[in-house]
């Protein structure tokens, strides 16, 4: 799988930009705030229907325009895909794949698979559990439509349960009983799928991490949840909801469930979030991203596109070398302010260079 072309109209700082991409390595070079990341953002949006930078779709529209248009042409082994997206300032959007209207975001996912690595991804390791849950949810939604459906349903019912906890009456226990049964069903599936994904990360990620660190470090991923027996997760979750109901009524919120879960990343049995150096934390994220690439490849039979947003300059030479030596079978789109540091590791015959300046792109 690879992206053949991207066409943007009124997207961020682009008026009307058509770009053909190499199936190998594409490098966009330019100063900051020229539009390099906007290219990656448009591709990422075409993949999952969301931006990695903003929750407001209207932010993607050029400031003096009423709508933006994105077209991404994707070459697949079985069937090529043309993804068209119109986003309007009133909050509406229209998406088609091969001219067929998409009604749900789950129908968009899987047509264009990408893995993005940006400096902000250090938050997966360093910051709150929400960042780690988000990572798991996005990666699982790419490869599992049932997971996406159950996650949406879980969050919807969770919101309704929390509203009921804030506005309870003498029928509150009957109402919460219904919510708890539904949450247990969807929540158990989410927990089990997250745990399975982390098992895959452990198998694949350990080998990747050893390559990056020359066998000096061992990485491990461990799911942190209240559930002890994954085979009976639904029953156990229902029991925990009932056990914590009094506390939930006092706090007006749901205190346990997959929306509270986390996962631990340890290197040589030490918690990387608390005790890891910045270099170790970057390496852990690198391992997560490259393991995610392999998991997608194993499931769908094709590598996703790899988007590297200004991250190579933050890696030392050993990690730069690992990245650039690992992408020969993967379409990779790189943004950077200069290629001097990575030039010696690039395969010139497999690389296409572009210069980006104030929303204009020049192929070199």
From Swiss-Prot:
What are the annotated disulfide bridges?
none
Q: Where in the cell does this protein reside? A: Cytoplasm
**GO term, biological process aspect, one:** double-strand break repair
* GO molecular function list: ATP binding; single-stranded DNA binding
GO CC, sorted alphabetically, is: cytoplasm
PROSITE patterns (UniProt xref): RECF_1
State the InterPro entries in the record: DNA-binding_RecF, DNA-binding_RecF_CS, P-loop_NTPase, RecF/RecN/SMC_N, RecF_2
Q: Which domain of life is it from?
A: Bacteria
Q: Give the primary localization class.
A: cytoplasm
Where ATP is bound, by residue? 30-37
Keyword terms, alphabetized: ATP-binding, Cytoplasm, DNA damage, DNA repair, DNA replication, DNA-binding, Nucleotide-binding, SOS response
Q: Which family does it belong to?
A: Belongs to the RecF family.
Question: Would you tell me the protein name for this molecule?
Answer: DNA replication and repair protein RecF
Please name the source species.
Clostridium botulinum (strain Loch Maree / Type A3)
């Amino acid at each position: 799988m690879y992206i053949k072309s991207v066409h943007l109209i009124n997207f961020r700082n682009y008026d009307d930009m058509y770009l053909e991409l190499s199936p190998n390595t594409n490098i966009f070079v330019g100063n900051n705030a020229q539009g390099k990341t906007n290219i990656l953002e448009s591709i990422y949006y075409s993949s999952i229907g969301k931006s990695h930078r903003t929750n407001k779709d209207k932010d993607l529209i050029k400031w003096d325009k009423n709508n933006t248009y994105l077209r991404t042409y994707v070459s697949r082994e079985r069937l090529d895909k043309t993804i068209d997206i119109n986003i309007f300032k009133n909050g509406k959007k229209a998406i088609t794949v091969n001219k067929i209207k998409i009604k749900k975001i789950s129908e968009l996912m899987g047509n264009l698979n990408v893995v993005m690595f940006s400096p902000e991804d250090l938050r997966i390791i360093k910051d709150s559990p929400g960042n780690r849950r988000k990572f798991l949810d996005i990666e699982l939604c790419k490869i599992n439509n049932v997971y996406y459906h159950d996650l949406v349903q879980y969050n919807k019912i969770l919101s309704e349960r929390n509203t009921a906890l804030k506005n309870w009456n003498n029928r509150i226990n009957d109402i919460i009983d219904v919510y708890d049964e539904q949450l247990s069903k969807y929540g158990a599936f989410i927990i089990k799928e997250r745990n399975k994904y982390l098992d895959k990360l452990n198998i694949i990620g350990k080998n990747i991490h050893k390559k990056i660190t020359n066998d000096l470090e061992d990485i491990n991923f461990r799911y942190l949840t209240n559930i002890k027996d994954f085979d009976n997760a639904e029953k156990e979750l229902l029991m925990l909801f009932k056990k914590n109901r009094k506390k939930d009524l006092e706090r007006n919120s749901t205190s346990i469930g997959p929306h509270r879960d986390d996962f631990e990343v340890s290197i040589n049995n030490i918690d990387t979030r608390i005790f890891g150096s910045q270099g170790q934390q970057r390496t852990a994220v690198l391992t997560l991203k490259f393991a995610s690439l392999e998991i997608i490849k194993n499931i769908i039979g094709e590598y996703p596109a790899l988007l590297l947003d200004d991250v190579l300059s933050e890696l030392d030479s050993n990690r730069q070398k690992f990245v650039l030596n690992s992408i020969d079978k993967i379409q990779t789109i790189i943004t950077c302010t200069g290629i001097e540091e990575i030039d010696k590791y690039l395969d010139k015959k497999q690389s296409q260079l572009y210069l980006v300046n104030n929303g204009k792109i020049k192929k070199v």
